[in-house]
């Protein structure tokens, strides 16, 4: 297996399995973490709470990087009708509010939406997708377009919005309980007490990941925490990791296939939406989540509050 050593993997090691020098760096940066935590806490106060008349559910996490928010949002959309996803649209090359999908019709380009939003747009059970830096405007637009439920991707820190907060608890904990840059936490760890439900893998949901072995495939991925795909590394001839949200270039992928005498790219769906027009033969790594009764019933109870 060949691995491309890059900044993304260095960060993964720094936050979750640091060596001696990375631990030293974390302590050197600790004063910056204290400042970061202070301003992060300050930002959660002094804003009027905004209340909506329909269910708003947030799926988020405290730590840096991916913890499975996208598969969990998809799982909620499979369980409940009329779900619209609202997200910031990280790394998109556009500003403001864009309706990416409405009632199963895709209305904008990948450049305008960003990779995560476009991945949602291809999910049949999701009725609409909206990107907006201002989540309140995004929620308002979703309900205007007929959403029954709005699911916010990565909005735990938006405490000015009254919502049902699901906080994903990762199986792999950050090495230090510090905020950025000394640790992986975006908010101090005690903020988890503000969640309505802390979802733990195995107890509240089950994660499925599947792809067939293919010796003629190169695995290429640009997701956070690529080692989540560890069990699949041996299923391809070679593996390459790129920075989260990386914009693939056709020529570089062609060169990787030629280098290893392969004819197929092994990708997550988030990666696939960025290369689908390149004409490559692709094999998708299926990443799914199934809700367990503990989480499903909590969401049902919350939704029923709006039916009274």
UniProtKB/Swiss-Prot annotation:
Function: Transfers the gamma-phosphate of ATP to the 4'-position of a tetraacyldisaccharide 1-phosphate intermediate (termed DS-1-P) to form tetraacyldisaccharide 1,4'-bis-phosphate (lipid IVA).
Xref: Pfam families: LpxK
Catalytic activity: a lipid A disaccharide + ATP = a lipid IVA + ADP + H(+)
Domain of life where this protein originates: Bacteria
Gene coding for it: lpxK
Family classification: Belongs to the LpxK family.
One GO term describing the cellular component: plasma membrane
Binding site for ATP: 63-70
UniProt keyword Transferase present: yes
Protein name (Swiss-Prot/TrEMBL): Tetraacyldisaccharide 4'-kinase
Gene Ontology MF term list: ATP binding; tetraacyldisaccharide 4'-kinase activity
Keywords, ordered alphabetically: ATP-binding, Kinase, Lipid A biosynthesis, Lipid biosynthesis, Lipid metabolism, Nucleotide-binding, Transferase
Any single biological process term in GO: lipid A biosynthetic process
InterPro entries assigned: LpxK
Pathway(s) where this gene product acts: Glycolipid biosynthesis; lipid IV(A) biosynthesis; lipid IV(A) from (3R)-3-hydroxytetradecanoyl-[acyl-carrier-protein] and UDP-N-acetyl-alpha-D-glucosamine: step 6/6
Enzyme Commission designation: 2.7.1.130
């Amino acid at each position: 297996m060949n691995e491309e050593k890059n900044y993304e993997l260095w960060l993964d090691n720094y936050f979750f399995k640091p060596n001696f020098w990375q631990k030293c760096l974390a302590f050197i940066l600790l004063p910056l973490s204290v400042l970061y935590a202070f301003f992060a806490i300050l930002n959660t106060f002094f804003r009027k709470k905004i209340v909506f008349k329909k269910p708003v559910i947030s799926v988020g996490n405290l730590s840096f990087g991916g913890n499975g928010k996208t598969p969990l949002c998809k799982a909620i959309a499979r369980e409940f009708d009329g779900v619209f996803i609202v997200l910031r649209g990280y790394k998109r090359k556009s500003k403001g509010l864009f309706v990416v999908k409405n009632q199963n019709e895709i209305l904008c380009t990948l450049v305008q939406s960003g990779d995560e939003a476009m991945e949602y747009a291809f999910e049949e059970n999701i009725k609409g997708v909206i990107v907006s830096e201002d989540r309140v405007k995004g929620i308002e637009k979703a309900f205007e377009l007929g959403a029954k439920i709005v699911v916010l991707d990565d909005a735990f820190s938006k405490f000015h919005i009254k919502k049902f907060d699901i906080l994903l608890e990762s199986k792999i904990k950050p090495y230090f309980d510090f905020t950025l840059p000394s640790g992986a936490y975006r908010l101090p760890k005690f903020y988890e007490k503000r969640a309505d439900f802390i979802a733990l893998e195995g107890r509240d949901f089950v994660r499925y990941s599947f792809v067939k072995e293919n010796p003629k495939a190169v695995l290429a991925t640009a997701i956070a925490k690529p080692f989540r795909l560890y069990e699949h590394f041996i299923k391809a001839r070679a593996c390459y990791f790129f920075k989260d949200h990386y914009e693939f270039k056709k020529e570089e992928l062609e060169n990787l296939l030629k280098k290893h005498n392969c004819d197929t790219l092994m990708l997550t769906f988030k990666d696939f939406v960025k290369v689908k027009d390149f004409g490559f033969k692709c094999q998708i790594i299926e990443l799914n989540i199934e809700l367990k009764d503990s989480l499903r019933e909590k969401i049902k109870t919350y939704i029923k509050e709006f039916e009274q």
